[in-house]
A protein has these predicted regions:
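Extended, well-folded catalytic/binding cores that form a central cleft or groove in large enzyme
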Residues: 1-626
Length: 626
């Protein structure tokens, strides 16, 4: 999503496109954002990048801020009552030299008048330099992935949408929130999509409202956001994209599934949030004497972003491959270590004082090559250390909870393969947490063509309770299965059983905890998850009972037709899959793998919220307690 990056750069440059190859000093300024703005900016721009754009300070709108009267301020906030009041207060207090007000979503006329009145009252009309609607009310996590919100995400969660006691008004509010973000997304993209969705679902409600909102904007020729120089006019200039709106209820097994690829595992077992992973590291490895206080935990955060080449290359790889690659990178770096020492001595850097590099001038021939090659080598070392720590933390979970065994067993259930161990034995096995066992059983229950008999179910429930499981999620899934059409035709996941290549016995980097012994070296087969199958049918215009009755909307058509018959018979080159009710990295990776083999085609994955299995099972549990 280069468009979002460009839109932010433009905004931080006072809404003027930055001049290419500009050598002049940037204008120094402060950035004032709310939590929504912070969540949009932080996955895309580092503190260093902000500084390069002239941002000397970035502060939360509702924090205590001192006046800096000789510096301009760029605001990036949601147009809420609370935020508008605080901005008016800033004008009255004359905190900054000038004010560039940017709203994440469109501001209403009445709120705009409140700001105008405050500016007049504070005698600050000339200081309010610009007021912009940015239409950036969504969070870009990858070039091809976005999520609606992080703040207040419980308001648009799976639980919120599927509550049995939800009122029509509450449902309208949820749908309007989702539609506002999707509208912003397409304004930023600069494209009007063709919309397809299943009938009788929350996804259909979103489709109807989004179609109406896009249609109304197009009809208002003077104020249409889809004409002229839109930021995104490049990416989809040849053909309009397809928007596939999918309801989470079409597949509840995938979000519960144990996974085997790096990014999805990090999200499943670690604290991974808006592209940042937080790890707890014990200080000191030696064991504490009995009765002594437990060692303090050191908290470390790592950003896993587009600039991390290792992450970009391996985030979709099976975990054993990642472990292997970390080892190879380490060995290749060790071969260059002598070179690093030599370069450091040339540059007069002691030990690990890497901060000194930026202070050095390359005014001698001897230093020139060192200055260019040392930062590259040190960056390589930083990434190796980072991924050694992250992968080691993941590996600890795999080994202590036997996640490879759970992953393989669930794959067999979902692909209807022969099971080598009974489900009761898996639940009774001491390995794995109560939550792991509940996830496994729910996948079995969701995937089975025929629900287990009452006698069998009671046996399973007893085993789950003995294992310490909370049965509330099962109560909800039972109700869901009884009400859903899918009960008669369980979701097919294709034949995806992973192929074991025997056990790992290789010790990874000697002297570290990277020992893969006892972990299955599973090689993934291509999974054909429901979302991927639906996308393939609609993108390639295939006739299939699963998608033949999907509704079709074209906001550019003068009259909205209720037809499910597509006007366009050509396959699509670009598609956006959006899951109403929450998405996950397993689905995202599955779509990325699918599109790799399709030359010239692109897919973006979006969801109303991004949850891991722990967060999802908590929502199912809350629904089951109703």
């Amino acid at each position: 999503m280069m468009q979002v990056f460009l839109a932010l750069k433009r905004m931080l440059n006072f809404n003027v496109p930055p001049v290419k190859n500009s050598t002049g000093e940037p204008v120094w300024k402060v950035l004032i954002y709310d939590r929504f703005g912070q969540d949009i900016i932080s996955p895309l721009l580092s503190v260093k990048e902000l500084r390069d754009m002239g941002i000397t300070l970035h502060l939360l709108l509702h924090s205590d801020r001192d006046a800096i009267p000789d510096v301009p301020a760029v605001y990036f906030v949601m147009p809420t009552e609370e935020n508008i009041d605080r901005m008016c207060q800033d004008l009255r207090n004359q905190l900054y030299e000038s004010y560039y007000l940017n709203f994440i979503s469109a501001i209403s006329r009445s709120k705009l008048e409140d700001i105008a009145n405050a500016a007049i009252g504070a005698n600050a009309v000339t200081q309010v330099a610009k007021v912009f609607d940015q239409y950036l009310n969504f969070i870009t996590l990858e070039d091809d992935m976005f999520v609606l919100c992080n703040q207040n995400k419980e308001l648009v969660s799976y639980r919120a949408i599927n509550r049995p006691d939800i009122t029509d008004t509450e449902m309208e509010t949820i749908m309007d929130t989702i539609v506002d973000s999707l509208f912003c997304f397409f304004v930023t993209l600069g494209a009007i999509p063709i919309i397809r969705c299943s009938r009788g679902t929350a996804a259909e409600m979103v489709a109807v409202k989004l179609d109406k909102k896009l249609r109304e904007n197009l009809r208002d020729a003077r104020n249409s956001l889809f004409t002229g120089d839109t930021l995104g006019a490049g990416q989809f200039s040849f053909q309009r994209p397809l928007l596939v709106l999918v309801d989470r209820n079409i597949d509840l097994a995938t979000p519960l599934h144990h996974t085997w690829t790096y990014q999805a595992l990090v999200h499943d077992v670690l604290d991974f949030h808006l592209n940042r992973v937080n790890l707890e590291e014990s200080i000191g490895m030696e064991s504490s004497p009995a009765g002594a206080r437990p060692k303090k935990k050191n908290k470390k955060s790592y950003d896993l972003t587009a600039s991390d080449k290792f992450w970009q290359k391996h985030k979709g790889s099976p975990f054993p491959e990642v472990a292997e690659s970390v080892q190879q990178e380490l060995e290749s770096y060790r071969a260059q270590e002598d070179e690093v020492k030599r370069l450091k001595s040339i540059m007069g850097i002691e030990g690990e004082d890497e901060g000194a590099i930026s202070m050095l001038s390359d005014n001698t021939a001897k230093l020139t090559s060192a200055v260019s090659s040392l930062p590259e080598l040190l960056e390589k070392k930083r990434l190796i250390d980072l991924h050694t720590n992250v992968a080691t933390a993941v590996l600890e979970h795999i080994k202590s909870r036997k996640l490879d065994v759970y992953f393989e067993y669930e794959e067999k259930i979902m692909s209807k393969s022969t099971l080598d161990k009974s489900l009761l034995d898996m639940i009774s096995d001491p390995d794995g947490t109560p939550e792991d066992k509940m996830r496994l059983f729910l996948i079995y229950y969701i995937s089975s063509t025929q629900a287990p008999s009452e006698i069998d179910l009671e046996q399973y429930k007893k085993a789950l309770m003995d294992a310490g499981c909370n049965l509330a999620p099962l109560s909800y899934i039972k109700q869901w299965k009884a009400f859903t059409k899918m009960a008669s035709a369980p979701t097919s996941y294709g034949n995806t059983t992973p192929k074991p290549l025997g056990l790992f016995s290789r010790v990874m980097n000697t002297g570290s905890q990277f020992v893969m012994e006892g972990v299955k070296n599973l090689v993934l087969k291509q999974q054909n998850l429901p979302v991927r199958r639906i996308l393939d049918n609609l993108m390639e215009m295939k006739s299939n009972p699963e998608t033949d009755d999907y509704r079709y909307f074209d906001p550019k058509m003068l009259r909205g037709s209720d037809s499910s018959v597509p006007r366009n018979k050509n396959p699509f080159q670009e598609a956006i899959v959006f899951v109403v009710g929450g998405g996950n990295y397993i689905e995202y990776q599955n779509l990325i793998d699918y599109i790799k083999g399709k030359q010239g085609k692109h897919v973006l994955y979006g969801c109303s919220e991004l949850f891991n299995a722990t967060q999802f099972i908590k929502q199912l549990s809350q629904l089951g307690q109703k």
